[in-house]
A protein has these predicted regions:
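Conserved catalytic-core segments of large NTP-driven translation/proteostasis enzymes
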Residues: 1-112, 118
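C-terminal effector modules of nucleic-acid-centric enzymes and ribosome-associated factors
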Residues: 106-216
Length: 216
């Protein structure tokens, strides 16, 4: 096919440790269900690499906020079911949207409370960052702005919004050196080094995409 000559289908990496970006999280239990019939919390998202199988142990990062220490702590659980548009499965490969049933207390997953988290095998999940060093590449004009606003250089103490995988967080620039920007995050994110993020700046009453960056 001609399209394959110009835009090749990416190869699926099944050998690396799995990495699932959580796009939705649910409590699927109906009100009033008896305790012995409760299902664990469900995570929905895309498996970008690796494979998952039922009964495997998983780690979820950043996890939940410990209100005593004001720090996020990883959550550990086990896969109880796997599903896709094709139905229930024993194992899943990269690509497409999947649902991961877990043995988590459903109160941890209700109302999309784990959106933006990353799921993998214990001790093999990417690092969680409270501060980021980002090599930036700014656009000429802000994307989505009807006025074709020119993108100025990022300044120290400027507020930015970052998108990494399915995670969205705000941050404050604490240092700018050439094309490397250090950002203190309001909420930590879990992301691999050398992964790409989207950078937005508030222009008027909306956030506008102004560039991309690579976590260094």
């Amino acid at each position: 096919m001609a399209i394959e000559e110009n835009i090749k289908t990416s190869k699926k990496d099944k050998k690396s440790p799995p990495m699932l970006h959580v796009l939705r999280s649910f409590d699927i239990n109906r009100p009033g269900l008896s305790i012995n019939k409760l299902n664990g919390g469900v995570l929905g998202g895309t498996l970008s690499k690796g494979t998952f199988s039922i009964d495997e142990d998983i780690e979820i990062r950043p996890g939940h906020l410990n209100k005593k220490t004001n720090k996020y702590e990883p959550i550990y659980s086990k896969i109880s079911s796997l599903g896709s548009s094709a139905g229930l499965m024993e194992s899943v490969n990269p690509g497409g949207l999947i649902a991961v049933g877990t043995k988590l207390d459903p109160s941890l997953t209700k109302s999309d409370s784990l959106v933006g988290a990353v799921v993998g095998y214990p001790n093999e999940v990417a690092d969680t960052h409270e501060n980021l060093d980002v090599k930036i590449d700014l656009f000429d004009v802000a994307i989505g702005s009807p006025d074709m606003i020119k993108v100025d250089k990022i300044k120290n103490k400027e507020a930015l919004r970052l998108n990494a995988g399915t995670a969205i967080t705000a941050g404050l620039v604490t240092n700018v050196k050439n094309d490397i920007v250090t950002i203190a995050l309001r909420r930590p994110i879990t992301a691999e080094y050398n992964s790409r993020i989207a950078i937005s700046r508030r222009l008027g009453d909306r956030w506008r995409l102004i560039g991309v960056g690579v976590i260094s």
